[in-house]
Amino acid sequence: MQRRIMGIETEFGVTCTFHGHRRLSPDEVARYLFRRVVSWGRSSNVFLRNGARLYLDVGSHPEYATAECDSLIQLVNHDRAGERVLEELLIDAEARLAEEGIGGDIYLFKNNTDSAGNSYGCHENFLVARAGEFSRISDVLLPFLVTRQLICGAGKVLQTPKAATFCLSQRAEHIWEGVSSATTRSRPIINTRDEPHADAEKYRRLHVIVGDSNMAETTTMLKVGSAALVLEMIEAGVSFRDFALDNPIRAIREVSHDVTGKKPVRLAGGRQASALDIQREYHAKAVEHLRNREPDPQVEQVVDLWGRTLDAVEAQDFAKVDTEIDWVIKRKLFQRYQDRHGFDLSDPKIAQLDLAYHDIKRGRGVFDVLQRKGLVKRVTEDETIDDAVENPPQTTRAKLRGDFITAAQAAGRDFTVDWVHLKLNDQAQRTVLCKDPFRSVDERVERLIASM
C-alpha cells in the first residue's frame, strides 16, 4: 500500500499556576479548557470542521486526533494544527479565569510524562489490508519500533536514585507489553484491538502506541514515515533478518538509556544485536526498496534523514542532525545550559527546561523560541498549518466529514458524526455510512448537504 491512510492521536499534559489564593484541580482546569467546546458541541467529545476529533481523555488529558491523512507533510500540518487548536482553548480559558477573579497561567505540554511519573501517549494509526498476516507485521515491526527511539525519541532527563541520566525516549519507561489489546492498563507497543474505522472486511487499523510526542516537524515525519515504509516493505514481501527480541520490554528501556546505540540487547535464542545494528538493517532495506518504488520526494526525505541520524549516532557527531531530531536538539540545549551555568543534569532548572521545551504556547514554549531563531528545521509553513486548523485534508474521507460539519453548523442543524457515520438529527434521522477512508467525493454526502 503506497498510498496509506495515517493519523496521529496526541494526549496533552495540563497544569496551571495560580496568582491568587484560589487553586483548581487538574479536572477543573480541563473543564475550563473545554468550556468553549462544550458550549457549541454540547459535549467534551467533538469532531471539528477540519475533520479532527477533540476530546477530554481519561485523567483530564485533552486529546487531539488528526483527520485521516494520506501523505506525510499533510499529516505533519494536521498534527501541528492540533497544537494551534489547543492553544486557542488555553488562551480562552485563561481569559475566563481572569474574568472570574482566578488569576492563573495554564500550560499545555506536548510531552509524555508529568512530574508525578504518569504517562500519556502519542498514538500512530496506519491503515493495513485485512488480507495480510497481522502476526507477521507485528513480528517484523516490533524490533523496529523498540529501536526507533534512536532516530525519533523526544529525549528526557530521567532522575534515578543514583544520578540523573539523559534518555532517548519519554515513553520507554512506561511500556509494559509487546502486543496487546489494552492501551491504558498494560501499555503495549502495538495495540491489537480491532477497530478499523473503515470496511472491516477489507482493512485493519494498526495502532502503534510506543512513540513519543514530537515537537520537531522533521522528527514527526521521520517517526511516522519510517514506520509506514517498514509496513509497506512487509506488505511487499521484503524479507528481514530475524531480530526477535528476548524481552521487548527490557530492550526498550535499555535502548532508551544508551545514546550511543551500541549496547547489545538480547535477542531470542541467546543472540545479541545493538539498536544501531537493528536500525541499520531496516534502513538498508528501505534504501533498496526505494530503487524499485515510485519516486516520492517525501519518502526520500525520510530515508535520507534516517540514514544521516544513524551516521550521527554511530560517529557521536550530531552536527548534521542537531536541527532535525528532537532528542538531539534537546540534549544540545541542556549541554549549552549546563556549560553556561555550571549546572548538573539533576538540577531542577534542567527539569524545568525539559518541560518548557514541550510548552505549546507560542512566544513562551522553548521549542517555539528555537524555531523562531531558525534553530530547528521545518517541513510546513505557518500558512499551511493555519489552513489545516480550518480545513480537512482534501484527499481523504475527512473532506466529507469536514464539509458536512461546516454545512450543518452554517445551517444551524443538529447533527452527529463519528469516523464513519454522518447523521442529521431530524425526523428522518438520515445517516450516511462512509466506509472507504480513501474516498473524498460521495454523492450521498452531497445530497445530504444539499438537503439542509
Curated annotation (Swiss-Prot):
Disulfide bond sites: none
Source organism: Rhodococcus erythropolis (strain PR4 / NBRC 100887)
Protein's gene: pafA
GO biological process terms, semicolon-separated: modification-dependent protein catabolic process; proteasomal protein catabolic process; protein pupylation
Designated name of the protein: Pup--protein ligase
Catalytic site positions: D57
Functional note: Catalyzes the covalent attachment of the prokaryotic ubiquitin-like protein modifier Pup to the proteasomal substrate proteins, thereby targeting them for proteasomal degradation. This tagging system is termed pupylation. The ligation reaction involves the side-chain carboxylate of the C-terminal glutamate of Pup and the side-chain amino group of a substrate lysine.
Catalytic reactions of this protein: ATP + [prokaryotic ubiquitin-like protein]-L-glutamate + [protein]-L-lysine = ADP + phosphate + N(6)-([prokaryotic ubiquitin-like protein]-gamma-L-glutamyl)-[protein]-L-lysine
Keywords on record: ATP-binding, Ligase, Magnesium, Metal-binding, Nucleotide-binding, Ubl conjugation pathway
InterPro entries per UniProt: Pup_ligase (IPR022279), Pup_ligase/deamidase (IPR004347)
Residue positions binding ATP: R53, T66, W419
